[in-house]
Amino acid sequence: KSYTGGLIAPESDNNLWNYKFTWNPRNVVLAGQGGDAKYIEENKEISISYNDLFKNTESLLIDQYGEFEAYANRDSLKYRSIYKLNDIGTIYRGTIRRAGFCNAWNIFVQLGMTDDSYNIENSNNMSYREYVKYFFQSNSKNSVEANIKKKFNLDEKDIVWQKLLELDIFSDINKIPLTNATPAQILEHILVKNWKLEKNDKDMIVMYHKFGFKKNNVLHQIDSTMVSIGEDEKYTAMAKTVGLPLAIAALAILNQKIKSSGVILPVSK
């Protein structure tokens, strides 16, 4: 099992979602779309639809950094052949978030706010509140707040409700500056205003791997973790962990330590 997440470092974590954008916001909003998430666990193949993805999370505890959760990341099954692990009984790729994130994010999914397949006409004339109201029947006599509370069984003290309020999505004042935008594009706009890295913010990459194997007929497990903290909003952990391996490979090619050509994966010596 392999888990990875681009998160916000504890010292820069100052919102209820425990999250800020440390890479492409659009990819975060659309995460999980484009097909069922698939993996195999104890020789059983499992498939999870996008609609159910954020309801099916796994709890993780990372030493010194606390509680996290993970959801299945796209199709893990194809990596069996890539890594020559065709007979493996468990292979799972997961995306890490802080505990509680997915439960709140699931509201956006269920309402249809992450849909990028159609455009909302005259979206540039809408307020945030009108955007949220768009996903409920126009003849509803209840307020948009009441509709959401009823649909998702929330009350004023619920942390999920507090997370929604923090985003100011019920505002009549805040306007959407996007013309004929998709629901996902509008949601991205709202979230970027709330979750962008501020000056001197530090991001955090968390990687957690579980390796199970049998030796001398005895089952063993090895856990491997890596946590990388960025320097600031520019020199991020995301930039380092993505960019440095590529730079190392480029130098190895120039120094002829890597002699293969073309697009190659790091799966062989």
Enumerate the predicted regions with their spans.
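C-terminal catalytic/substrate-binding lobe primarily of soluble NAD(P)-dependent oxidoreductases
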Residues: 2-269
